[in-house]
Amino acid sequence: FGSLLGICLLTQIITGLLLATHYTADTSLAFSSVAHMCRDVQFGWLIRNLHANGASFFFICIYIHIGRGLYYGSYLNKETWNVGVILLLTLMATAFVGYVLPWGQMSFWGATVITNLFSAIPYIGQTLVEWAWGGFSVDNPTLTRFFALHFLLPFAITGLTLVHLTFLHETGSNNPLGIPSDCDKIPFHPYYSMKDILGFALMIIPLAALALFSPNLLGDPENFTPANPLATPPHIKPEWYFLFAYAILRSIPNKLGGVLALAASILVLFLIPLLHKSKQRSMTFRPLSQILFWTLVANLLILTWVGS
C-alpha cells in the first residue's frame, strides 16, 4: 500500500494545483469560486471530485498500510515507523485545513469546533486559539492561512515520504514471515513494477467510479450551504476518516480529557515499537495477538459508525 499512497499523494498534488489556480481564498468568494470551478472550468467538476474523493482513498490506503505494519511487526524498523506516524499526523492536518477551504457550513463549523479544542490547553489555550484564528472567530484571516497551509503541507508530506523511504532503504522491507529475506531478493523491474501497476489499477478504478457516479456519497450535504456564522448545523461532524477520533473525543464529558484521548488515539502509535515483547516479529503464528489485532480493527470500525 506504500506505492498506492505515493500515487495518492501525486494525484492529490496534481489535482490540487489545478484547483488552486481557480480558487479564491476569501470568505466572500471561496464558496462561489468552487461553484464556478465545477460549472465553468473545463473538467473542473472532475478535478474537484477526484481531489475530494482522492482524500478518502488516501486515508483508506494509509489506514490499511498502518494496519499491515502492525500485523507484520514492521514497526520494529523504528525510524521508518516514527517518520510514518509523523506522516499520518501531517496528512490529517492537511485534510483538516483542506476541508475548510470550500467555506460551506460544515467547513466553517468543523474549523470552529476543532480549532476550539486548543482552548482546552491550560493557561495558553485561549491565546493559542485566537492566534490560530487571527481574530476572535473563524473568519477571513483563518481561511487565508488555512489555504496557505493546505498548499504547503503536501510538499512537507513529499519531503517526509523521501525520509521515510530512505530509512526503509537502510533495512530493506519486511515480509509476512518476519524473517530476513536477503536470499529471496528479486529485481524491482519487471516484478515489483508489475505488482504496483496492478495495485494502481485496482485503486484508480474505484476512485474514478466514485468520482464519476456518486461524487457526493462521502461528503456532508451541509457543505452545499455557504458558511453562516449565525446558524449552527444540527450535527457537526468531520469527514468519515476522522469519525473514529471524533467519537473518542465526544465520548468523554471533560473537554481537556477528550482532547487528550483524541491525541492519544493517534500518538499511541509511537509507543508500539517499545511494547513489542514477542520473540517472533509478525503475527502470522500468534493467534492470540491476531484476535487482539482484529478486535482493534473492529473497534475502529464501530467507533467510525458510532461517530456518524
Swiss-Prot record:
Residues involved in a ubiquinone binding: 169
GO terms of molecular function: metal ion binding; ubiquinol-cytochrome-c reductase activity
Superkingdom of this protein's organism: Eukaryota
Subcellular location per the Swiss-Prot or TrEMBL entry: Mitochondrion inner membrane
InterPro entries xref list: Cyt_b/b6_C, Cyt_b/b6_C_sf, Cyt_b/b6_N, Cytb/b6-like_sf, Cytochrome_b_C_euk/bac, Cytochrome_b_N_euk/bac, Di-haem_cyt_TM
Cofactor: heme b
Pfam families documented for this protein: Cytochrom_B_C, Cytochrome_B
Record keyword Lipoprotein present: no
The entry's keywords: Electron transport, Heme, Iron, Membrane, Metal-binding, Mitochondrion, Mitochondrion inner membrane, Respiratory chain, Transmembrane, Transmembrane helix, Transport, Ubiquinone
GO biological process: mitochondrial electron transport, ubiquinol to cytochrome c
Binding residues for heme b b566: 65, 164
Chief location: mitochondrion
SUBUNIT field: The cytochrome bc1 complex contains 11 subunits: 3 respiratory subunits (MT-CYB, CYC1 and UQCRFS1), 2 core proteins (UQCRC1 and UQCRC2) and 6 low-molecular weight proteins (UQCRH/QCR6, UQCRB/QCR7, UQCRQ/QCR8, UQCR10/QCR9, UQCR11/QCR10 and a cleavage product of UQCRFS1). This cytochrome bc1 complex then forms a dimer.
Additional comment: Heme 1 (or BL or b562) is low-potential and absorbs at about 562 nm, and heme 2 (or BH or b566) is high-potential and absorbs at about 566 nm.
UniProt record similarity statement: Belongs to the cytochrome b family.
Protein name (Swiss-Prot/TrEMBL): Cytochrome b
Species: Ptiloprora plumbea (Leaden honeyeater)
